[in-house]
Swiss-Prot record:
Transmembrane segments: none
Top-level division of the source organism's lineage: Eukaryota
Gene Ontology cellular component list: cytoplasm; cytosol; prefoldin complex; RPAP3/R2TP/prefoldin-like complex
Modification sites for N6-acetyllysine: K21, K66
Positions of modified residues (N-acetylalanine): A2
Native organism: Bos taurus (Bovine)
Protein family according to the UniProt entry: Belongs to the prefoldin subunit beta family.
BP term (GO), one: protein folding
Function statement: Binds specifically to cytosolic chaperonin (c-CPN) and transfers target proteins to it. Binds to nascent polypeptide chain and promotes folding in an environment in which there are many competing pathways for nonnative proteins.
Pfam families (alphabetical): Prefoldin_2
Protein name: Prefoldin subunit 6
Keyword match Nuclease: no
Length: 129
């Protein structure tokens, strides 16, 4: 009985560890998006300071290519919208993973109690080993 519970407990621990890895990956991804959001907001602010007489370039591979100011502003705006949507998606994913992780912790606690009871019963019943 105790061996069966121990195997089940081990499987649940592995699931919990995988959830923690997924949670860590999602947090890392969200942090990268936050950095991109900050960077793009700075670019948007800088583009807002320019007027039509200024020349704007964008980097395509190793080459700088002239770009219209309006087009550059639109591109940055679209990028900000995309990054914001991705951050919301990551936040939702993080909430789900945290909820799953909490449920997994509760399952682990129950299995640990069952295992301890089985161990105690095994120790309390001499000759059944």
């Amino acid at each position: 009985m105790a061996e069966l519970i121990q195997k089940k407990l081990q499987g649940e621990v592995e699931k919990y560890q995988q959830l923690q890895k997924d949670l860590s990956k999602s947090m890392s991804g969200r942090q990268k998006l936050e950095a991109q959001l900050t960077e793009n907001n700075i670019v948007k602010e800088e583009l807002a300071l320019l007027d039509g007489s200024n020349v704007v370039f964008k980097l395509l591979g190793p080459v700088l290519v002239k770009q219209e100011l309006g087009e550059a502003r639109a591109t940055v705006g679209k990028r900000l919208d995309y990054i914001t949507a991705e951050i919301k998606r990551y936040e939702s994913q993080l909430r789900d993973l945290e909820q799953q992780s909490e449920q997994q912790r509760e399952t682990l606690a129950q299995l640990q109690q069952e295992f301890q009871r089985a161990q105690a019963a095994k120790a309390g019943a001499p000759g059944k080993a």
